[in-house]
């Protein structure tokens, strides 16, 4: 077990959920808990959100769905965003998982298993309105409109789409996608709809439809949401170095003065990117401390020379992620996004869930 502690504030996640629910008003709000709840624990987060009446949980794969179903029981809907494949269709049926069907081939597979089981099988349809990732194409949607037998045997519960640039509120592409989505929905007047991801919720009620599907905003990856994550690491080694001493692999940092250098027990094997070498920072008692030298697999060095002497001791905790250094802020240093910071968090951390 790592000496580092990853604290996940469940109350903050629940408060974020309730804030989003308040914005959505009459629309339902689900939760994207794929990639193990963005690295924070899908089961723990889902159980907490169930207490706030969340009933829709979105995962990426059937494996994620099965694990969640085993933990949560049958009282919630679990949606598999990557859809259904020949090899996992029976597993989806056994564990009451609902696939989001992304193309005619997946519809065909699900229809085949509906015939085998002699019953309707639940599904969502994903219409591609412009993100051009997953989703039925315009030609495929037209085929569905003209031949409803293509959906025979399927219990179509929702039609969804996904916004490509919802974090940019004024980007006209959002409205373009909305209008395309609405045009398709006219042909399915009795089917519920879902469009808004986290950013989409903040675009206004026109984007909310029947169900919103936030992920990032639940986990604090939005300026108005509360950060629920704190990652701390203790100082495990201290050394006094003289002027012109080299630090770390390839000697990429050289001291410009007599320095006190501390070592922390985490590295790129724990999801702390090598790109932070010589440019990241941590915080000790609210004071910024620079990272010096290369990030190693299991270790990083920090320059604590400017800290008060009483703050420099073995076991002193440094905050890697927290209110001083949120995932979004950290991500901006190395040109990535907060999603990647969270989902990269390694399995060695001691995870503590607090209310």
UniProtKB/Swiss-Prot annotation:
First-tier enzyme category under EC: isomerase
EC number(s) stated in the UniProt entry for this protein: 5.1.1.1
Keywords on record: Isomerase, Pyridoxal phosphate
Catalytic residues (UniProt): 34, 249
Modification type N6-(pyridoxal phosphate)lysine: residues: 34
Keyword presence, Isomerase: yes
Residues that bind substrate: 133, 297
GO molecular function: alanine racemase activity; pyridoxal phosphate binding
Pathway where this protein functions: Amino-acid biosynthesis; D-alanine biosynthesis; D-alanine from L-alanine: step 1/1
Biological processes annotated in GO: D-alanine biosynthetic process
Cofactors: pyridoxal 5'-phosphate
One GO cellular component term: cytosol
Catalyses which reaction(s): L-alanine = D-alanine
Record function comment: Catalyzes the interconversion of L-alanine and D-alanine. May also act on other amino acids.
Family: Belongs to the alanine racemase family.
Annotated PANTHER family: ALANINE RACEMASE, ALANINE RACEMASE, CATABOLIC-RELATED
Name this protein carries in UniProt: Alanine racemase
Organism: Rickettsia akari (strain Hartford)
């Amino acid at each position: 077990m790592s000496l580092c502690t990853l604290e996940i504030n469940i109350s903050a996640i629940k408060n974020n959920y309730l804030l989003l629910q308040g914005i959505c008003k009459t629309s339902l709000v689900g939760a994207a808990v794929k990639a193990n709840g963005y690295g924070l624990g899908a089961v723990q987060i889902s159980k907490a959100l169930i207490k706030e009446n969340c009933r829709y949980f979105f995962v990426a794969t059937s494996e994620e769905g099965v694990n969640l179903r085993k933990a949560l029981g049958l009282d919630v809907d679990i949606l598999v965003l990557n859809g259904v494949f020949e090899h996992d269709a029976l597993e989806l049926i056994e564990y009451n998982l609902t696939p989001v069907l992304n193309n005619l081939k997946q519809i065909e597979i699900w229809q085949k298993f509906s015939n085998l089981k002699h019953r309707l099988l639940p599904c969502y349809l994903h219409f591609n309105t412009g993100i051009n990732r997953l989703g039925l194409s315009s030609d495929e949607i037209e085929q569905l409109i003209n031949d409803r037998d293509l959906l025979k045997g399927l219990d179509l519960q929702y039609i969804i789409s996904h916004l490509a640039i919802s974090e940019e509120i004024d980007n006209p592409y959002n409205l373009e996608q909305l209008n395309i989505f609405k045009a398709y929905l006219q042909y399915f007047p009795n089917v519920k709809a879902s469009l808004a991801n986290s950013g989409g919720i903040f675009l206004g009620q026109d984007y909310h439809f029947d169900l919103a599907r936030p992920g990032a905003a639940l986990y604090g990856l939005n300026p108005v949401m509360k950060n629920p994550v704190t990652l701390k690491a203790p100082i495990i080694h201290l050394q006094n170095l003289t002027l012109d001493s080299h630090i770390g692999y390839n000697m990429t940092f050289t001291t410009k003065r007599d320095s006190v250098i501390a070592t922390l027990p985490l590295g790129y094997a724990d999801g702390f990117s090598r790109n932070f070498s010589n440019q990241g920072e941590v915080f000790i008692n609210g004071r910024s401390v620079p990272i010096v030298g290369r990030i190693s697999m299991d270790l990083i060095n920090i320059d604590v020379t400017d800290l008060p002497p009483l703050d420099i001791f073995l076991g002193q905790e440094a905050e890697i992620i927290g209110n001083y250094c949120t995932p979004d802020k950290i991500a901006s240093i190395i040109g990535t996004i907060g999603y990647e910071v969270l989902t990269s968090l390694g399995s060695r951390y001691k995870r503590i869930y607090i209310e």
